[in-house]
């Protein structure tokens, strides 16, 4: 954790690790600032497990605590994720856009709510397919970029 209040002088607050680290690529904090979701871009390839989104309790920035992981039903690489209105929008390369509910995050559980597969051939842990997803349009539209597939403009119907 780094305090960047003064951009010219960043200050480390704390540092931690977790079992099975590959390459921490991207994180996002929940709106209440109690939890952090983390994508590790290489763990699926290095350790041969399914897509894992790490969940951290960051209520105490001096002692962030890894409370669990959401493990998906595909081995695709997780790349970029964002949180909006109680959902996680996660670009998982060959598994496409995955939408997860946040309502049980304190129990370290993320529940699948929907998906759109931009690479239907397979879900292998390779670097093609959904690169990112942008869920912040006021209309509810989600833009998903596929590395070779192009741009998908979606309007998810989430129950």
Label each residue range with its predicted role:
Residues 1-159:
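Feature marking well-ordered beta-strand scaffolds used for ligand recognition
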